[in-house]
């Protein structure tokens, strides 16, 4: 189903579009969380810590895939909004060709420098080998990660958020089943977790690719279209590169934070690993609504209806606030039960560390959703410089405050840095949003 954001009230279209996207991300995150849960429950605290220690590094690789997703989504949204179906197909094939080349480079780099990266963040020695093993297997799946994210970006640009959900339902179930077989039955430990993810991503990517190209056959008619278009390549990367830089900056910040966490031993690392997965689950739910706003904004700009964008922004704020409240209640009121999903009762120190993180960070979700909705509008409008610039203070403040607070409050002080970074980033993003509105005129 293709959604046109340029006609109906956003209260209707954004809600209908967001729900399948939200479930897609939920299932994607569920099998990420399942990796950690099964590792912690069946392979032990050190296995959970090893997967968790490598997680900030995998997020850097993910940043490239998400950047290509965004680049393809915004460019295709504009072409689709303008009614240029031939352009849509050329932009899609260009995005795939570019992403395959990028995936090859990242795979080679990740494999040969995995041990160096784990050493740079001072990974505890008792989990170092497992962390490196997990990372090496993970990078073999870069081609699938890239392909799936570009497919998802194109489906989103065309207003179809249901198709990616169907693929994720199957691959999520498959990933969990494979986790249980490889880790609980075969006792492959961390390697079993990594291979389960690799296989699940591969199935999802191939199915998404086949479905997308079968759907695009009608877009260009019988006339043969060029597979690669230099102009669309430049447009895609003009959006993708700032997004990659923005997310990489965040990921580097997370690496610095992980470095600080690692100094407190594998128990704190394990607790942080579980808590950060829960935090990421919530944040990604909110981010999907921001992605909806990007498509909404890009389509309306392409159709010459930019005056509809502030209306969509207000709808996004309302929906995101409603989504944030249950997570705040769950993570603050039931933090022990949440950490119990990952760790057995004997891992008391790890559970306590994770509970502290959730109780300190989760109440601020009601603020970060404002930034994420504003980010969605700014990305869709193509103002990527502002989008990137609002991220830097979050990074700097989070690292500085983590260093300062940890000296007096130990690992608890690290978690206290999150709200300060979010406050600065939210204020800056709102300032940039107002500038975008003034510069464009129609966004007033």
Task: Give residue ranges: language-model regions.
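Helix-terminus/linker motif at the lipid-water interface of multi-pass membrane proteins
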Residues: 30-48, 118-125, 181-188, 248-277, ...
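N-terminal transmembrane alpha-helices
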Residues: 5-42, 56-71, 75, 100-107, ...
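Small-residue-rich hydrophobic transmembrane alpha-helices
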Residues: 48-108, 145-164, 271-335, 368-382, ...
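Short alpha-helical transmembrane segments in multi-pass integral membrane proteins
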Residues: 1-18, 76-141, 185-241, 297-363, ...
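Transmembrane helical elements of multi-pass membrane transporters/channels
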Residues: 16-35, 137, 148, 171, ...
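Short runs within selected transmembrane alpha-helices of multi-pass transporters and secretion channels
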Residues: 69, 138-156, 164-172, 193-208, ...
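Small-residue hotspots at the loop-to-helix junctions and early N-terminal turns
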Residues: 43-56, 131, 135, 194, ...
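Hydrophobic transmembrane alpha-helices of multi-pass small-molecule transporters
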Residues: 60-63, 107, 175-180, 204-209, ...
